[in-house]
A protein has these predicted regions:
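Bacterial N-terminal signal peptides
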Residues: 14-27
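Sec/Tat signal peptide C-region and signal peptidase I cleavage site
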Residues: 28-32
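An N-terminal domain-start capping segment
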Residues: 11-16, 77-78
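Intrinsically disordered, low-complexity terminal regions enriched in Ser/Thr/Pro/Gly
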Residues: 33-191
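N-terminal secretory signal peptides that target proteins for export/translocation
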Residues: 1-12
Length: 191
C-alpha cells in the first residue's frame, strides 16, 4: 500500500510541476514573441508611406544607367567607364538601377519580377542583334526590395569599328509595364 500511495503522491507532484513549468514557458514564449525595440517616429513612418505612394505612382524608371568596368557587385557597387569607347571583341558591361516596379504580396513576403531584353543598333537605327527576356531579376523578401541593381554583359564578336547604340528594355512582369534606355558607344580597332 505504501508503495502505491507514494507513487500517487509523486504523480500528483509531477503534474503540479509540469503545470508550473508550462505556465512559465508560456509567459517566456509571449515575451520572446514581442521583441523590445525602438519604433520609427511618426514622421519617418509618414515619409515612408509617401515614398511608397510615389514609387507606385511613378511607374518603372531608372535612377542610374551607365557602362561599367566589369559587372557591378551589388546596389551602387560599380565603377563607371571613363568613356563609351570599347575595343573590338571587348566585353561591354552596363549597370542599371530600376525603380518603380510593382510587388506581389503573399504570406512569403513581397515578390518583384523583371525581365530584360536588348537591341544592338547602328547609327541609322538598323537592328544588328536582339534578344527578348535574356535576363531575369526576381526575388521575394519580407520587406519591399527597393535597392535592385542590374548588371548586364554583352560580347559582340565581329562588330566592325564605328558608332552604335545599345538599347535595353525592362519589363515589369507583375506591374505589366516597361521602361528602357539607350546608351551610345563606339567600337575601335583592338590594339
Amino acid at each position: 500500500m505504501t508503495k502505491q500511495a507514494s507513487r500517487f503522491k509523486l504523480g500528483r507532484n509531477s503534474t503540479s510541476l509540469a503545470l508550473v513549468f508550462g505556465i512559465l514557458a508560456a509567459a517566456g514564449s509571449a515575451v520572446a514573441q514581442s521583441p523590445d525595440y525602438k519604433s520609427p517616429s511618426p514622421a519617418f513612418t509618414e515619409a515612408l508611406a509617401a515614398f511608397d505612394a510615389a514609387w507606385a505612382a511613378d511607374g518603372l524608371a531608372f535612377s542610374a544607367v551607365t557602362f561599367t568596368d566589369g559587372p557591378g557587385s551589388g546596389y551602387g557597387k560599380y565603377t563607371a567607364t571613363e568613356n563609351n569607347v570599347f575595343s573590338a571583341g571587348e566585353t561591354i558591361a552596363l549597370y542599371a538601377e530600376p525603380v518603380g516596379y510593382a510587388f506581389d504580396q503573399s504570406q512569403d513576403g513581397y515578390t518583384y519580377k523583371l525581365a530584360a531584353s536588348y537591341r544592338l543598333m547602328n547609327t541609322s537605327g538598323q537592328v544588328l542583334s536582339e534578344q527578348s527576356d535574356f535576363a531575369e531579376f526576381t526575388g521575394t523578401t519580407r520587406s519591399k526590395q527597393r535597392q535592385l541593381s542590374a548588371s548586364l554583359s554583352f560580347q559582340f564578336d565581329g562588330l566592325p569599328e564605328g558608332d552604335y547604340a545599345l538599347e535595353a528594355t525592362f519589363a515589369d512582369q507583375i506591374g505589366n509595364q516597361t521602361a528602357g534606355f539607350k546608351l551610345p558607344f563606339t567600337i575601335q580597332a583592338a590594339n
